[in-house]
C-alpha cells in the first residue's frame, strides 16, 4: 500500500478532518487499491465551521460524515498553525467533484445526480456524458416535495449508483445524504452545493490566480456585494485562528 491510499486526520475545534496533500492524494485515497470508498464527503470551510458551532443538528450530521476535508484556505491555514508539520493543502469541492466525475467516466462507475434547477441539471448531465462519458444512471432536480423523498431514495437504490452527488446547499444536502444512506448505504455520497451551476457556466468562478492566492472569497465578495454580511460573520473564525482557539 503506498502513502497515497492513507491520510492523517487533524482536529479543529473538535471536528476531525482528513489531511490530503493535494488532489492526486485525495483521488488515490478515495479509490484505494482500485476500490471506491463508501461514505459521505463533506467540504469544510470557515463558514461551515461557524454553522457547526451554532447548530447542534448540523454538528451531528457533519460529525457523522466519514470524509471531512479542507475546502477553504482558512481551514488549511488553521490546520498548519495547529499542526506545524502537517502536509495538507486545500482541495476545492468543485474541483474534487470534476475529478471524481472524470475518474467515474474512465472506469464506468455509475453516478446519480441530485439537486439544482431542472435546466442546470440537464446541462450538467449532457456535459458529463460529452466530456467524460459518465455513466449517469439517474437524476433528480432539487424541486421535489418532502413526501417524494422516500420514493427518490428507492430510485437511487434501484439504480445501483456507486457515486451520489447532491447539490442542495447545506444543511439540506447533508440531511438528504444521511437519510438516503439508510436505504442505499453502498455508495460514496458528496455534497456539492452550487457546483452544477459553476460546471455549466451559470455561475462564474474566481480566476485561477485568485484561487491560488487564497482570495476566492474576496472575488466572490466583489462579484456579489450582498455577501458582505456572510463575510463579516467570518471575523469570529479569524478570532479563533489568531488566538489559537483551535
From Swiss-Prot:
Q: What is its EC number?
A: 2.4.1.180
Q: Which GO terms describe its biological process?
A: enterobacterial common antigen biosynthetic process
Pfam families in the record: Glyco_tran_WecG
Query: Protein transport as a keyword?
Result: no
Q: In which pathway does it act?
A: Bacterial outer membrane biogenesis; enterobacterial common antigen biosynthesis
Is Glycosyltransferase given among the entry's keywords? yes
Alphabetically list the UniProt keywords: Glycosyltransferase, Transferase
Record GO terms (molecular function): lipopolysaccharide N-acetylmannosaminouronosyltransferase activity
State the protein's purpose: Catalyzes the synthesis of Und-PP-GlcNAc-ManNAcA (Lipid II), the second lipid-linked intermediate involved in enterobacterial common antigen (ECA) synthesis.
Q: Per the similarity annotation, which family is this?
A: Belongs to the glycosyltransferase 26 family.
Tell me the protein's name. Answer: UDP-N-acetyl-D-mannosaminuronic acid transferase
Chain's gene name = wecG
Amino acid at each position: 500500500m503506498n502513502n497515497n491510499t492513507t491520510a492523517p486526520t487533524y482536529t479543529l475545534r473538535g471536528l476531525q478532518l482528513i489531511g490530503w496533500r493535494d488532489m492526486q492524494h485525495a483521488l488515490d485515497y478515495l479509490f484505494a487499491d482500485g476500490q471506491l470508498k463508501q461514505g459521505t464527503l463533506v467540504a469544510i470551510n470557515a463558514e461551515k465551521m461557524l454553522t457547526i458551532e451554532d447548530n447542534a443538528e448540523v454538528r451531528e450530521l457533519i460529525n457523522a460524515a466519514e470524509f471531512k476535508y479542507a475546502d477553504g484556505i482558512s481551514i488549511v491555514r488553521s490546520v498548519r498553525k495547529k499542526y506545524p508539520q502537517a502536509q495538507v493543502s486545500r482541495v476545492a469541492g468543485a474541483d474534487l467533484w470534476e475529478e471524481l466525475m472524470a475518474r467515474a467516466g474512465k472506469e464506468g462507475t455509475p453516478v446519480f445526480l441530485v439537486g439544482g434547477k431542472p435546466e442546470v441539471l440537464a446541462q450538467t448531465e449532457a456535459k458529463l456524458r460529452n466530456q467524460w462519458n459518465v455513466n449517469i444512471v439517474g437524476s433528480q432536480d432539487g424541486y421535489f416535495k418532502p413526501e417524494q423523498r422516500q420514493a427518490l431514495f428507492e430510485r437511487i437504490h434501484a439504480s445501483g449508483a456507486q457515486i451520489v452527488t447532491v447539490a442542495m446547499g447545506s444543511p439540506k444536502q447533508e440531511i438528504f445524504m444521511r437519510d438516503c444512506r439508510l436505504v442505499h448505504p453502498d455508495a460514496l455520497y458528496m455534497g456539492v452545493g452550487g457546483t452544477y451551476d459553476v460546471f455549466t457556466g451559470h455561475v462564474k468562478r474566481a480566476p485561477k490566480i485568485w484561487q491560488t492566492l487564497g482570495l476566492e472569497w474576496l472575488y466572490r465578495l466583489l462579484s456579489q456585494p450582498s455577501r458582505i454580511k456572510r463575510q463579516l460573520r467570518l471575523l469570529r473564525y479569524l478570532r479563533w485562528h489568531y488566538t489559537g482557539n483551535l
